[in-house]
Protein backbone atom coordinates (compact mmCIF):
# COMPACT_ATOMS: atom_id res chain seq x y z
CA UNK A 1 0.00 0.00 0.00
CA UNK A 2 1.36 3.41 -0.92
CA UNK A 3 1.86 6.07 1.70
CA UNK A 4 -0.85 8.69 1.92
CA UNK A 5 1.49 11.63 1.51
CA UNK A 6 -1.28 14.18 1.99
CA UNK A 7 -1.75 13.15 5.63
CA UNK A 8 1.35 15.10 6.66
CA UNK A 9 -0.56 18.28 5.78
CA UNK A 10 -3.48 17.53 8.10
CA UNK A 11 -3.66 19.78 11.18
CA UNK A 12 -3.08 18.17 14.58
CA UNK A 13 -6.17 16.41 15.87
CA UNK A 14 -7.66 15.66 12.45
CA UNK A 15 -8.52 12.00 12.10
CA UNK A 16 -6.96 10.56 8.98
CA UNK A 17 -9.43 7.70 8.68
CA UNK A 18 -13.19 7.96 8.31
CA UNK A 19 -15.05 4.96 9.68
CA UNK A 20 -17.46 4.32 6.83
CA UNK A 21 -19.14 1.54 8.80
CA UNK A 22 -20.69 4.18 11.08
CA UNK A 23 -23.04 5.32 8.33
CA UNK A 24 -25.85 3.65 6.42
CA UNK A 25 -25.62 6.07 3.50
CA UNK A 26 -23.64 8.94 2.06
CA UNK A 27 -26.48 11.29 3.01
CA UNK A 28 -26.21 10.15 6.62
CA UNK A 29 -22.46 10.88 6.47
CA UNK A 30 -23.17 14.39 5.10
CA UNK A 31 -25.84 15.12 7.70
CA UNK A 32 -23.47 14.08 10.49
CA UNK A 33 -20.80 16.44 9.18
CA UNK A 34 -23.26 19.30 8.79
CA UNK A 35 -24.41 18.77 12.39
CA UNK A 36 -20.96 18.34 13.95
CA UNK A 37 -19.41 21.34 12.22
CA UNK A 38 -22.49 23.57 11.87
CA UNK A 39 -20.86 26.79 13.07
CA UNK A 40 -17.61 26.37 11.14
CA UNK A 41 -16.91 27.89 7.74
CA UNK A 42 -17.39 25.27 5.04
CA UNK A 43 -16.43 27.37 2.01
CA UNK A 44 -15.05 30.81 1.32
CA UNK A 45 -15.03 32.65 -1.99
CA UNK A 46 -14.51 36.27 -3.01
CA UNK A 47 -14.66 37.49 0.59
CA UNK A 48 -17.91 35.65 1.35
CA UNK A 49 -18.27 32.58 3.55
CA UNK A 50 -20.85 29.89 4.11
CA UNK A 51 -21.06 27.76 7.25
CA UNK A 52 -21.92 24.09 7.30
CA UNK A 53 -25.28 25.00 8.85
CA UNK A 54 -26.04 27.41 5.99
CA UNK A 55 -24.83 24.90 3.43
CA UNK A 56 -27.08 22.26 4.96
CA UNK A 57 -30.16 24.52 4.86
CA UNK A 58 -29.53 25.84 1.36
CA UNK A 59 -28.72 22.43 -0.11
CA UNK A 60 -31.85 20.92 1.46
CA UNK A 61 -33.96 23.71 -0.02
CA UNK A 62 -32.38 23.33 -3.46
CA UNK A 63 -32.78 19.56 -3.21
CA UNK A 64 -36.52 20.05 -2.72
CA UNK A 65 -36.61 22.34 -5.75
CA UNK A 66 -34.82 19.74 -7.87
CA UNK A 67 -37.15 16.92 -6.83
CA UNK A 68 -40.47 18.69 -6.28
CA UNK A 69 -40.42 21.41 -8.94
CA UNK A 70 -38.13 19.98 -11.62
CA UNK A 71 -39.26 16.39 -10.90
CA UNK A 72 -35.71 15.02 -10.98
CA UNK A 73 -35.39 11.64 -9.35
CA UNK A 74 -32.72 9.31 -8.05
CA UNK A 75 -30.37 8.36 -10.88
CA UNK A 76 -31.19 11.36 -13.07
CA UNK A 77 -28.23 13.43 -14.23
CA UNK A 78 -27.68 17.07 -13.36
CA UNK A 79 -25.04 18.90 -15.32
CA UNK A 80 -23.32 21.61 -13.33
CA UNK A 81 -21.26 24.11 -15.27
CA UNK A 82 -19.99 26.54 -12.71
CA UNK A 83 -16.85 28.36 -11.71
CA UNK A 84 -15.60 27.98 -8.15
CA UNK A 85 -18.33 29.99 -6.43
CA UNK A 86 -20.39 29.34 -3.30
CA UNK A 87 -23.38 28.22 -5.34
CA UNK A 88 -21.44 25.19 -6.57
CA UNK A 89 -21.32 23.24 -3.27
CA UNK A 90 -24.99 24.08 -2.67
CA UNK A 91 -25.95 22.54 -6.02
CA UNK A 92 -23.55 19.63 -5.53
CA UNK A 93 -24.82 18.63 -2.09
CA UNK A 94 -28.45 19.19 -3.11
CA UNK A 95 -28.04 16.73 -5.95
CA UNK A 96 -26.10 14.20 -3.87
CA UNK A 97 -28.65 14.20 -1.05
CA UNK A 98 -31.37 13.52 -3.67
CA UNK A 99 -29.51 10.64 -5.31
CA UNK A 100 -29.03 12.67 -8.47
CA UNK A 101 -25.87 12.02 -10.46
CA UNK A 102 -23.70 15.13 -10.76
CA UNK A 103 -21.96 15.65 -14.09
CA UNK A 104 -19.47 18.51 -14.08
CA UNK A 105 -18.84 20.19 -17.40
CA UNK A 106 -16.41 22.75 -18.67
CA UNK A 107 -17.50 25.78 -20.72
CA UNK A 108 -14.62 25.02 -23.09
CA UNK A 109 -16.00 21.58 -23.98
CA UNK A 110 -16.86 21.01 -27.62
CA UNK A 111 -20.37 20.04 -28.69
CA UNK A 112 -19.30 16.39 -28.94
CA UNK A 113 -17.81 16.45 -25.46
CA UNK A 114 -20.96 17.95 -23.98
CA UNK A 115 -23.17 15.41 -25.77
CA UNK A 116 -20.97 12.64 -24.36
CA UNK A 117 -21.59 14.02 -20.86
CA UNK A 118 -25.34 13.49 -21.33
CA UNK A 119 -24.98 9.78 -22.11
CA UNK A 120 -25.80 7.29 -19.40
Model-inferred region functions:
Residues 48, 65-112:
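Conserved AMP-binding/adenylate-forming
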Residues 1-50, 54-69, 74, 98, ...:
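N-lobe entry segment of adenylate-forming
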Residues 114-120:
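Short, intrinsically disordered, charge-balanced linker/junction segments flanking boundaries
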Residues 31, 92, 115:
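Short glycine-/small-residue-rich flexible loop motifs, especially phosphate/cofactor-binding loops
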